């Protein structure tokens, strides 16, 4: 019998060729950027929210910096965070680093004209809205509308100028849920909008 007569060949593990070398797959990094109010405006300070995910869509820890600027940042929770940035050029890039691997991403292009709108909590039941427009748009009366669950909760006006204009909005009586602030002119043109989650104290 051939199989019984054939000699047994023993190969030591160290002598065996490695036919399938172990390779480490580079982690795919995705990053999305969301200027507060929807737009980056040249020479106007803006907060930029971001989210960093892997190839499965899950948020991951990361650090980053704006190329050519002394601006660094890191994720806070589930791959999300924010940084403050004043664009001086139309196009800017951000470097995101995850586990020692760095990728470069484009920020949304900065626009030459428009408004930057920021929304911050003020006490336990109010928010303060700040609006800062470019020179050619100053001196206009703009509308500010607050909706929650698709219903109008508040409406008022704000006067735009070179310095940020402010308006305080009470959230008393506003139900818990996703709210949205809209900035628009007398013709109904929407310049900026911003969502936030309101947690009712009732």
Where are these regions (language model features)?
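N-terminal, cleavable Sec-dependent signal peptides of secreted/periplasmic/extracellular proteins
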Residues: 1-202
């Amino acid at each position: 019998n051939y199989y019984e007569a054939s000699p047994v060949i023993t190969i030591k593990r160290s002598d065996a060729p490695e036919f399938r070398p172990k390779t480490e797959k580079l982690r795919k990094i995705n990053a999305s950027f969301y200027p507060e109010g929807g737009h980056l405006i040249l020479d106007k300070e803006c907060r930029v929210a971001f989210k960093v995910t892997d190839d499965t869509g899950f948020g991951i820890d990361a650090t980053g910096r704006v190329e050519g600027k002394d601006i660094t940042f890191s994720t806070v929770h589930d791959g999300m965070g924010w940084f403050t940035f004043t664009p001086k050029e139309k196009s800017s890039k951000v470097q995101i680093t995850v586990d020692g691997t760095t990728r470069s991403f484009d920020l949304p292009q900065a626009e030459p004209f428009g408004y930057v709108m920021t929304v911050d909590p003020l006490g336990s039941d109010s928010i303060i809205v700040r609006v800062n427009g470019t020179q050619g748009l100053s001196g206009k009366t703009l509308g500010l509308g607050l909706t929650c669950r698709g219903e109008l909760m508040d409406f008022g006006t704000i006067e735009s100028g070179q310095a940020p204009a402010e308006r305080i909005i009470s959230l008393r009586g506003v139900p818990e849920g996703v709210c949205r602030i809209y900035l628009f002119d007398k013709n109904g043109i929407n310049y900026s909008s911003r969502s936030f989650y309101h947690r009712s104290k009732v």
